[in-house]
Amino acid sequence: IYNHFLLPLSLSLIIFSCNNKEGYKLDMTAENIEVNWIGYKTNEKTAVSGSFSEFSSDRENQSFNSIDDLVDGLNFSISSLSSSSGDPIRDLNLKDYFFKYLTDNFEIEGTLGRPINDSIDVSFNILGQDKTVRFAYSTYLTTSKYSNKIIQIKGKLNLVNQFNGEAFNSIHKQCFDLHKGSDGISKTWEEVDVHIK
């Protein structure tokens, strides 16, 4: 028996800092970018996670005077066909009953706003309409293999109020029985947690 779930959108971006007065350089090669998601089902709020393997942006190999300048206006694109949850049947259901109704050509596109103190606006283009969501924003130093400064964005997305309700209804209907918990009630969570770093 396969457990299917609703997909939230979540990115994980690792930023490389030159750490000098000339500015910052963003190194967005495949090996130092993570794009992750977590979804929830059942009244017990069972979490299921996965990741996207294909991500691109318009800020690769460019230098900026600050992290804020680097982030402000960054356009990104994620191939939803690259979503993997470790369950091929679940991934196929997400493709045919969720992403098909959420995006054109299975591409999730968006733009990051300019950070303001501890928050940032992220605009998603959903079937030609821009949907803007505010998230918590922070940066921290790291000694990772790829970078010494990481951007972290946290928040919630509501896939009915903020995104295309048709996509939510489609995946909920397809996975109705699979989203039943121990109480026998089917639950697909509309609100999802997002963690970008």
Predicted features along the sequence, with ranges:
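Bacterial N-terminal signal peptides
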Residues: 7-14
